[in-house]
Amino acid sequence: MTTLRADRPYMQFNFKVEIDGQEGGFQEVSGIGTEVAVSEYRHGNDPENNVRKMTGLNKVADITLKRGAMGSDVLFKLLDDVRTGKAGNGKSMKIMLMNEDRSDTNPVMTWQLKNVRATKLTYGPLNAKGGDVAMEEAVFAYERLVLE
């Protein structure tokens, strides 16, 4: 695991995404995170009027990747593998926060997502009078988050 600098935070705009070893350029990544569900329990003859907090299942949010439309079918193929039953155990995904010099050898943080599957792919919006970049957005479900 790499060590973060303690003197100041890193900027959010230096990052890379790898899906099953293939690097992709994206404008935005959102949804990195994990949560542990907590259940409250109290039995009726408990002498204290407090509930017990018991940890439950781990949950992770879906990851959303946004980028300008590249004319590539890679994201579509990932979703198509899921639709046709060819996804197997899912892919691996790494999201790497890079330092200021964008050195490929030493990302400052790496989030590794396990058993990733594409769940949604959208294109657009398209507007004949618009001046924005045509976008594509992909949403991925995953089972586990590991911080490297």
Q: What are the residue ranges of the model-derived segments?
A:
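Glycine-rich, low-complexity intrinsically disordered segments
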Residues: 1-148
